[in-house]
C-alpha cells in the first residue's frame, strides 16, 4: 500500500490533460451538409472559424454560396461584410465542435434597397429629361 499511493500520485501528476480543440472542417462547399467532418486541431489552434460568402439579390436571384470551416490560432475580424449583392460572414468559437452551423454570410442585399439605390442614381437623368 505504501508503494501504491506514490505510484498512483506520480501517474496522475504525469498525465497531461488533452486540450486539443476539435472543429468541423471543409473548404468551399455549397452546403453545410458537406461541412460536418470533425477535425482535431493542433495545439496552437484556439478557435474554430467559419467563413460564409454569398452573392445574390434578396431571395430572388442567387449567384453563388461558399462555406469554409477550419481550425485557427487566431480569430479573424468577426464582422460581416455586405457590398450590395455580395456578402461575407465570419464567426469564431472556442469549444468542442462549436462551429456546427453556418456563419451569417448568407445576407444579401434587399430588393427594396437595390431598387431605391437605382432610382436615386437615375434621378438626375430623369430630372434633366423631364417635362
Curated annotation (Swiss-Prot):
Lipid modification (GPI-anchor amidated serine), residues: 101
Disulfide bond residue pairs: 23-48, 26-35, 41-71, 75-92, 93-98
Reported impact of residue 36 to A: Complete loss of viral entry enhancement. Abolishes inhibition of human coronaviruses entry
Domain UPAR/Ly6: 21-101
Any single GO BP term: host-mediated suppression of symbiont invasion
Outcome (variant: residue 57 to A): About 50% loss of viral entry enhancement
Signal peptide coordinates: 1-20
Listed name of the protein: Lymphocyte antigen 6E
Record-linked InterPro entries: Ly-6/neurotoxin-like_GPI-ap, LY6_UPA_recep-like, Snake_toxin-like_sf, Toxin/TOLIP
Keyword Ribosomal protein: no
Amino acid at each position: 500500500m505504501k508503494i501504491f499511493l506514490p505510484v498512483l500520485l506520480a501517474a496522475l501528476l504525469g498525465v497531461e490533460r488533452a486540450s486539443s480543440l476539435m472543429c468541423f472542417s471543409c473548404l468551399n462547399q455549397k452546403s453545410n451538409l458537406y461541412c460536418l467532418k470533425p477535425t482535431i486541431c493542433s495545439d496552437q489552434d484556439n478557435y474554430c472559424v467559419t467563413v460564409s460568402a454569398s452573392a445574390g439579390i434578396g431571395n430572388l436571384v442567387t449567384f453563388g454560396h461558399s462555406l469554409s470551416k477550419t481550425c485557427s490560432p487566431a480569430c479573424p475580424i468577426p464582422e460581416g461584410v455586405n457590398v450590395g449583392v455580395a456578402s461575407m460572414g465570419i464567426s469564431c468559437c472556442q469549444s468542442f465542435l462549436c462551429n456546427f452551423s453556418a456563419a451569417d454570410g448568407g445576407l444579401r442585399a434587399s430588393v427594396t434597397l437595390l431598387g431605391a439605390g437605382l432610382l436615386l442614381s437615375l434621378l438626375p437623368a430623369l430630372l434633366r429629361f423631364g417635362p
